[in-house]
């Protein structure tokens, strides 16, 4: 049985907007608490997408109010979850480095996540998704979905 796999790209874009906004605010205000909460939310979203703070705001507030319309397309969710995991790890590590006094490297990691999320939001290129599909092509265990499966 061939079950179509779909992803709501509006939910992903909403996550990116919240991530970019909160991380930029954390950087400008030099507020590692904000980046820490954002990183934790990203990690939770990667582990259990329905529980992610930004996903919940989209599903229970923004979408029902008609502020954002769903855009459900054939796609694999795993690469997006992997990208969220990579971003969450980088933000969390960056936050811990800032708290440990290694501020330049810590904030640099946060800024990299801002740049990559912006690249995905504005240009449609997901670095974490690309990494996922590379790992799939290399046969790395756990990276079982190929790009062609999303198009079926």
Describe every region a protein language model picked out.
Residues 1-152:
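Membrane-interfacial helix-loop segments of redox and metal-homeostasis proteins
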């Amino acid at each position: 049985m061939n079950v179509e796999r779909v992803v709501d790209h509006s939910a992903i874009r909403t996550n990116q907007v919240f991530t970019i906004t909160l991380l930029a605010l954390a950087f400008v205000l030099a507020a590692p608490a904000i980046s820490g909460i954002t990183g934790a939310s990203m990690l939770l979203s990667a582990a259990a997408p329905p529980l992610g703070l930004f996903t919940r705001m989209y599903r229970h507030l923004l979408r029902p109010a008609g502020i954002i319309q769903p855009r459900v397309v054939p796609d694999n969710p795993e690469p997006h979850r992997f990208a969220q995991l990579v971003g969450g790890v980088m933000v969390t590590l960056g936050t811990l480095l800032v708290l440990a006094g290694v501020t330049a490297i810590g904030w640099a990691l946060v800024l990299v996540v801002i740049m990559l999320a912006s690249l995905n939001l504005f240009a449609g290129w997901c670095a974490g998704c690309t990494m996922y599909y590379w790992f799939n092509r290399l046969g790395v265990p756990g990276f079982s979905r190929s790009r062609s499966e999303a198009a079926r």
